[in-house]
Amino acid sequence: MDYDFKVKLTGERERVEDLFEYEGCKVGRGTYGHVYKAKRKDGKDDRDYALKQIEGTGISMSACREIALLRELKHPNVISLQKVFLSHADRKVWLLFDFAEHDLWHIIKFHRASKANKKPVQLPRGMVKSLLYQILDGIHYLHANWVLHRDLKPANILVMGEGPERGRVKIADMGFARLFNSPLKPLADLDPVVVTFWYRAPELLLGARHYTKAIDKDWEDIKKMPEHSTLIKDFRRNTYTNCSLIKYMEKHKVKPDSKTFHLLQKLLTMDPIKRISSEQAMQDPYFLEDPLPTSDVFAGCQIPYPKREFLTEEEPDDKGDKKNQQQQQGNNHTNGTGHPGNQDNSHAQGPPLKKVRVVPPTTTSGGLIMTSDYQRSNPHAAYQNPGPSTSQPQSSMGYTSTSQQPPQYSHQTHRY
């Protein structure tokens, strides 16, 4: 390459440090790298962005896969990759995303903590339903375009804060995602282990030699149902003697003849062939009764969840989850199936980490179908419009409220 042209090209290349202010605003850390909350220096807009710096030099296979998929995938419930920056000086890769203030892991953690403090904050049923519906919508879009996410868990389900996309769910972290072009895919052709341990579908735990997109779409949906926060300990028990869904649901006041119970039964079916798909789940009667799902999961309510805190250079991403991570790593070591390392939800750190793959996967063929938006083509994908939301200035606690008188979160247990 001509030297003068190379110098000119280097001078014209956009550098992330020239465009964004992010120093001291780290909100996430893992073996994948670091995530910063950033703003434009030129003041062209007031939006918050998430800058993800890939760890190491060059581009790993995981980063390549994530970039390639996110450049093609366009859906309201899938995280949007705005731009990729390559720093030739230090060979760093930066990914620019929309910033999501919350994620499902921290939402669940907030409610579990409030319950432990004897001041439970009840989730409105409408919020739970909207969360679940939007997650299913995003998963269906991925599967309709022949993409398996393979690492769905609460930490990878982002929720937008105040702004144009308030309350919008975003599925993040495509580092483990794969294209597929056949009903069954041998496990040996890809990774020996997929999906974080606690969120694996039963067929993976039982040693299935093949898996379908059923591992990706429905078993994890139990975590988005209202009963998840109280059921988490039950699902971690080592023994399931005389176990039945009805026995567990009874103590959480879920009636066996309710639409909620029937949907849970269909989502938790052990046989992946009989388990309902994300599209079928979206058409379930549960979503057709009031309150209807909305595009803003916080519609009519305040947002009680604290904003993301900035981390220091030495501070771990999630101090409260060290014990869980150590326990997870111990289980993985015992079973010989774990891969601690990179857990990337584009913004924040959740439960056990996963390792970045450095061995190229087996080549697969097949393309992405991007010709239509699922929401426009499927009448069941339409959300109820919650109406315009006029936000007031934030309070000193960092929460926001609507101008109307919505149902308030309180420290009392209410029925919604």
UniProtKB/Swiss-Prot annotation:
Residues 1-15 are annotated as: Interaction with CCNC. Residues 325-343 have a biased composition (Low complexity). It catalyses: L-seryl-[protein] + ATP = O-phospho-L-seryl-[protein] + ADP + H(+); L-threonyl-[protein] + ATP = O-phospho-L-threonyl-[protein] + ADP + H(+); [DNA-directed RNA polymerase] + ATP = phospho-[DNA-directed RNA polymerase] + ADP + H(+). It holds the Pfam family Pkinase. One of its GO terms (molecular function) is ATP binding. Residues 313-416 are annotated as: Disordered. Residues 21-287 form the Protein kinase domain. Its EC number is 2.7.11.22, 2.7.11.23. Residues 361-378, 386-416 have a biased composition (Polar residues). It is found in: Nucleus. InterPro entries: CDK, Kinase-like_dom_sf, Prot_kinase_dom, Protein_kinase_ATP_BS, Ser/Thr_kinase_AS. It is an enzyme of class 2 (transferase). Gene3D superfamilies: Phosphorylase Kinase, domain 1, Transferase(Phosphotransferase) domain 1. Belongs to the protein kinase superfamily. CMGC Ser/Thr protein kinase family. CDC2/CDKX subfamily. Component of the Mediator complex, a coactivator involved in regulated gene transcription of nearly all RNA polymerase II-dependent genes. Mediator functions as a bridge to convey information from gene-specific regulatory proteins to the basal RNA polymerase II transcription machinery. Mediator is recruited to promoters by direct interactions with regulatory proteins and serves as a scaffold for the assembly of a functional pre-initiation complex with RNA polymerase II and the general transcription factors. Component of the Mediator complex. Interacts with ccnc. This is Cyclin-dependent kinase 8. It comes from Xenopus laevis.
